[in-house]
């Protein structure tokens, strides 16, 4: 019997061992590829995310506070830092979540409903704010609205019913808040709409009992956004935090009215950190 002959059982054992090794390598390679592709997709979508989450170098957002107070915080920040402003946007708007949709009929969550997942998000702006953002006039009558929407059904409708109140769709709009006002709800839902109404106070009063909320946003682009970016954000965070504490009734728990600070530097850093961590895991 020649010495170089391998028994059949030994050969089968080695083949099985090699097969397991190859399968393990294939699985690990697939995992690495999936991770790399995922990280690349996130990085490729970074620009869209930043436009949605942080359209300006520095910003202050308010919940259930007036626009004047929000703007004052930004003015204080600019005075303390000496940053030179190239562009500023200051707006007040409403937003609410859709509980149910039947064609063009919308049901809004009530004020007391908690821990809900909306089918869609709607942001509401006055026609004065629309003109401020676009330079264009709409001249809406009392029962008319203008609409930008990602909802396919709404795009073909002539009217819209919101909690039993009917509105005629005067015209369909382009994305008029892009690069001007953040829409963080894009992360939660892919279906969202922006309404323009003739009088935002009348619209808000017509939505009593619903979960509709009021928000403000003041964002600025500065001459040198990289100058002291982290230090500046820390200062803006401090200013917003102190102002929140001074709001009436804010003692314990999660406040109903509050200010929050944000910066493009911080948002971009979070995305880059997430991509870097994903690549490291891969």
Cite the ranges covered by each PLM segment.
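N-terminal Sec/SRP start-transfer signal
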Residues: 1-29
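Residue-level marker of positions within ordered structural domains that often coincide
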Residues: 16, 47, 225
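Hydrophobic alpha-helical transmembrane segments of multi-pass inner-membrane transport and secretion
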Residues: 18-42, 263-282
């Amino acid at each position: 019997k020649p010495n170089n002959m391998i028994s059949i059982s030994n050969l089968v054992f080695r083949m099985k061992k090699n097969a397991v090794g190859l399968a393990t390598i294939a699985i690990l390679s697939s995992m690495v590829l999936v991770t790399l592709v995922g990280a690349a997709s996130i990085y490729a979508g970074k620009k869209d995310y930043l436009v949605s989450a942080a359209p300006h170098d520095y910003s202050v957002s308010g919940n259930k506070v007036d626009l004047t107070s929000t703007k004052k915080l930004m003015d204080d920040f600019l005075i303390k830092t000496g940053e030179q402003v190239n562009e500023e946007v200051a707006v007040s708007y409403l937003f609410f979540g859709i509980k149910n949709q039947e064609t063009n009929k919308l049901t809004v969550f009530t004020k007391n409903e908690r821990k809900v997942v909306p089918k869609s998000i709607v942001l509401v702006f006055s026609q004065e704010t629309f003109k401020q953002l676009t330079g264009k006039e709409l001249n809406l009558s009392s029962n008319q609205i203008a609409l930008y929407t990602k909802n396919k059904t709404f795009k073909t409708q002539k009217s819209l019913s919101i909690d039993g109140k009917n509105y005629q769709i005067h015209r369909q709009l382009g994305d008029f808040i892009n690069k001007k006002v953040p829409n963080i709800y894009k992360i939660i839902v892919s279906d969202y709409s922006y309404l323009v109404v003739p009088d935002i106070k009348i619209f808000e009063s017509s939505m009593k009992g619903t979960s509709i909320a009021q928000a403000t946003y003041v964002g600025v682009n500065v001459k040198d956004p990289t100058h002291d970016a982290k230090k500046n954000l820390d200062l803006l965070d401090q200013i917003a935090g102190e102002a929140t504490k001074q709001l009436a009734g804010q003692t314990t728990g999660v406040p109903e009215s509050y200010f929050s600070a944000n910066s493009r530097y911080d948002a971009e850093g979070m995305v880059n950190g997430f991509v870097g961590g994903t690549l490291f895991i891969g």
